[in-house]
Amino acid sequence: MAQVTYNGTGRRKNSVARVRLVPGTGKITINNKDVVDYVPFANLILDMKQPLTITETTDSYDILVNVNGGGFSGQAGAIRHGISRALLTVDPDFRPALKSAGMLTRDPRMKERKKPGLKKARKASQFSKR
């Protein structure tokens, strides 16, 4: 018998996360590694689990994630966004709680591009009046 899965795609900065929720015990696997082995910061792990705590489904689903692009912070945001979208396919009644917490909104902030004549996006060389 095929197991029931719920899918969601999340994006943040340059990261894209494809999330699958499978009924289980709350184990999170990212790119075939345990979440503690993959993410070195505890605050990012809590950030990823936020949609689950809001909907009180922390121990109800195993989460399988395939994520690529960006750094740890961007990937954590993409995973959070993907989990939120997957939870909507589980139960559409989660929408008001997730939306009021801002979990369903794609964060549009991106890295600003480097401008010609400047050292970084906004950093210029020191100005000399004379």
From Swiss-Prot:
Biased composition (Basic residues): 111-130
BP GO terms, sorted: translation
Top-level taxon of the source organism: Bacteria
KW Cytoplasm (keyword) present: no
SUPFAM superfamilies for this protein: Ribosomal protein S5 domain 2-like
GO-annotated cellular components: cytosolic small ribosomal subunit
Keywords carried by this UniProt record: Ribonucleoprotein, Ribosomal protein
Claim: Transport is one of the keywords in the record: no
Cross-referenced Gene3D superfamilies: 3.30.230.10
HAMAP family the record matches: Ribosomal_uS9_B (MF_00532_B)
Protein's name in the database: Small ribosomal subunit protein uS9
UniProt organism field: Latilactobacillus sakei subsp. sakei (strain 23K)
Gene that this polypeptide is encoded by: rpsI
